[in-house]
Regions:
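Conserved class I S-adenosyl-L-methionine
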Residues: 56-67
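Short glycine-dipeptide loop
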Residues: 58, 81-82, 170-176
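A short glycine-rich, Lys/Arg-flanked "PGG" loop and its adjoining helix->strand segment in the class I
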Residues: 76-77, 157-172
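Conserved beta-strand signature within the Rossmann-like core of class I S-adenosyl-L-methionine
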Residues: 86-88, 163, 173-182
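A short acidic, Gly/Pro-enriched loop at the edge of an enzyme's catalytic core
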Residues: 117-120, 131-142
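A short SAM/SAH-binding and catalytic strip from SAM-dependent methyltransferases
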Residues: 129, 139-160
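Conserved Class I S-adenosyl-L-methionine
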Residues: 189-215
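C-terminal lobe and adjacent flexible extensions of AdoMet/dcAdoMet transferase-like proteins
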Residues: 247-265
Length: 265
């Protein structure tokens, strides 16, 4: 049954840009996705987020720092037949042990379901040193989900460098789609809170030549005031404070997130 559903999903992906929404819905409904990932669809809004970015099944898409592969499970089958997905993460040969571990975990993930991941290409995106994920001017869409807070500790110049590398990788008119934990406007977040000011992200993007093409509130959560002990990780799904105020954090839900669409002119 799972193979039949996956086959139907892939067929939907081959039906062309006119039916891109149906193909994306099919990718999200794919029964091969991990159940724990599916359970978070209501908080992460993958359909609304990706359609806002303008994704099409014929695109070359770069996913920066795919982590555990939450979005990779959707992007890989969606792009499998007519597009290309580049999973850009740590290098398997990195000098850093932690980076090699992340790379090995991603390899294990991709090799676990070849029918879903067999056409995923790998690129290197290892902050703050190595960015070798796509040739200049070849990507239609680059996406990053809740990663920018991991870049900021390296300083503004390093953050600007990352945005420049993304800009360089995109075709003219290409899109950089960003989702990030959002600090309240005018409130400087603690460095280790996981939150970033929206104005800061826009400033960094514009410094690299991007134009802000749109904002979406699809991933907004007004209940999140970004003032938690242990930062954003106090909230689901991590619940870093364990049983302390657990019900309070569950009632808040996942973080308030900016969703920004930048275009290379």
């Amino acid at each position: 049954m799972k193979r039949l559903i996956l086959a139907a999903m892939l067929a939907a992906g081959m039906s062309g840009a006119a039916h891109a929404d149906d193909a994306l819905k099919a990718a999200i409904a794919n029964s091969e996705r991990a159940s724990a990932n599916v359970a978070r669809d209501g908080a992460r809004h993958p359909y609304e987020t990706l359609t806002f970015f303008g994704i099409k099944p014929t695109m070359t898409v770069v996913e920066l720092s795919p982590g555990g592969g939450w979005y990779t499970e959707i992007l890989a089958p969606y792009l499998r037949e007519k597009g290309k997905l580049i999973a850009a993460g740590e290098s398997p040969t990195s000098a850093r042990e932690g980076a090699r571990k992340y790379a090995a975990n991603l390899t294990k993930k991709l090799e676990s379901k070849p029918a879903m991941f067999d056409k995923v290409q790998r690129g290197v995106f290892e902050v703050p040193t190595t960015y070798d994920f796509a040739k200049p001017g070849t990507a239609d869409l680059v996406v990053t989900f809740r990663n920018i807070h991991n870049w900021t500790g390296n300083g503004d110049e390093k953050v600007k460098e990352i945005f420049r590398k993304v800009h360089e990788s995109l075709k003219p008119g290409g899109v950089f789609g960003v989702v990030e934990h959002r600090a309240p406007a005018g409130k400087e977040p603690k460095a280790d809170s996981g939150y970033v000011q929206e104005a800061y992200v826009i400033k960094m993007a514009e410094s690299a030549g991007f134009k802000l093409a749109g904002k979406s509130e699809v991933n907004a959560n007004p209940k999140d005031k970004a003032d938690h002990n242990k930062g954003v990780w106090a909230l689901p799904p991590v619940l870093a404070n364990k049983d302390v105020d657990r019900e309070k954090y569950l009632a808040i839900g996942e973080s308030d997130r900016m969703t920004l669409k930048f275009v290379k002119q």
